[in-house]
Amino acid sequence: MDRRIFGLENEYGVTCTFRGQRRLSPDEVARYLFRRVVSWGRSSNVFLRNGARLYLDVGSHPEYATPECDNVTELVTHDKAGERILEGLLVDAERRLHEEGIAGDVYLFKNNTDSAGNSYGCHENYLVARHGEFSRLADILIPFLVTRQLICGAGKVLQTPRGAVYCVSQRAEHIWEGVSSATTRSRPIINTRDEPHADAERYRRLHVIVGDSNMSETTMLLKVGATDLVLRMIEAGTVMRDLTLENPIRAIREVSHDLTGQRKVRLASGREASAIEVQREYYEKAVDFVERRGIRTGTVDQVLELWGRTLDAVEAQDLDRIDTEIDWVMKYKLIERYRAKHNMTMSNPRVAQIDLAYHDIHRRRGLFYLLERKGQTARICNDLKIFEGKSVPPQTTRARLRGDFIRRAQEQRRDFTVDWVHLKLNDQAQRTVLCKDPFRSVDERVEKLIAGM
């Protein structure tokens, strides 16, 4: 599939401090956060003018699902627009708290674990053709996804009985199955619940829930871009070596605990391979595939260049080569500088604070944004595009139809209901349009519905 629909869903961690002490429960903080949303949307589950969905997920986690995008750079822009929207809710919530005499600071973290050991996710969605054999897709994809953390993990200070250690991935400790239809109970690598949000006879939606939430634009580009290339190879029937892992769940933890990428994991065939070797197998196949198919674009070149350079840098342990582009490396360097300056161990509580503060989405407070202000983060988006993404949907996918419909209905003060595939006016006629094709950004039926308001 040369043109694919992508979507990202990020759940955010939420907390509130009162002079450094927790004062409100996450439930109460979430209510303050969403008060403005509920006042206009009459619900804490709404679709926005940019085509995205914003809602309160299980356990008081705000979740932002990007609109459908058909290129990876646009997807990253819309994910960042989601951060900005939530930052706006945060500022608004703090103002309301202060007006009510509660001197609290509200924090939203774009990470995947909290101090109590709970995990919440970053879910990637890829539209794939229905005709392929899903089990083959999963078999080829799982070794890639288990080792992919090496190129796109967000990094984590993990507390263990033997003290704190730095790991590559936040989610690795919380994954318990390879393929499953549940997302919360068993936490698989790939979720098989079949909700394509499109024509079910033609498409299915691959739902990957093993990845970390990324702060870095370039890490996000690499995560989704490399996965897209692997999917294209599978769809084209490219012959791949059998890299099936003996135990993917053990392997994902072993890979996360080894910053060198050299530790061997056991394959089902009895062979052993390191995470670097597994990734190189996919990377070299992808380079060859792109050349043979003639599918080079600026984005594909960027993804392949960063993928190869990241593997080289990790293998040589020359992390300076990627310390503005890959989240786990950026955070690791930040922590190591701090530890050296203050002569402290990884187990020091202040190190755990830095780990968390890296993911604070408040741009004046978060450590990732401190690095960005200092020019120490590579970028692929610009701030104007991100600002536009808060209210303007992608113009080449179904999100445009949804966004235009919502904008018009709100301007005309009309009551309406939307989801990923339906647009409905709640008037006497109960007019509804079903939009099954996520690639379609122009539809006469929707134009008619909008014109009739």
UniProtKB/Swiss-Prot annotation:
GO terms for biological process: modification-dependent protein catabolic process; proteasomal protein catabolic process; protein pupylation. InterPro entries: Pup_ligase (IPR022279), Pup_ligase/deamidase (IPR004347). The active site is at D57. Signal peptide: none annotated. Mg(2+) binds at E9, Y55, E63. It holds the Pfam family Pup_ligase. ATP binds at R53, T66, W420. Pathway: Protein degradation; proteasomal Pup-dependent pathway; Protein modification; protein pupylation. GO terms for molecular function: ATP binding; ligase activity, forming carbon-nitrogen bonds; magnesium ion binding; ubiquitin-like protein transferase activity. The keyword ATP-binding applies. Keywords: ATP-binding, Ligase, Magnesium, Metal-binding, Nucleotide-binding, Ubl conjugation pathway. It catalyses: ATP + [prokaryotic ubiquitin-like protein]-L-glutamate + [protein]-L-lysine = ADP + phosphate + N(6)-([prokaryotic ubiquitin-like protein]-gamma-L-glutamyl)-[protein]-L-lysine. Its EC number is 6.3.1.19. NCBIfam families: pupylate_PafA. Belongs to the Pup ligase/Pup deamidase family. Pup-conjugating enzyme subfamily. The reaction mechanism probably proceeds via the activation of Pup by phosphorylation of its C-terminal glutamate, which is then subject to nucleophilic attack by the substrate lysine, resulting in an isopeptide bond and the release of phosphate as a good leaving group. Catalyzes the covalent attachment of the prokaryotic ubiquitin-like protein modifier Pup to the proteasomal substrate proteins, thereby targeting them for proteasomal degradation. This tagging system is termed pupylation. The ligation reaction involves the side-chain carboxylate of the C-terminal glutamate of Pup and the side-chain amino group of a substrate lysine. PANTHER family: PUP DEAMIDASE/DEPUPYLASE, PUP--PROTEIN LIGASE. This is Pup--protein ligase.
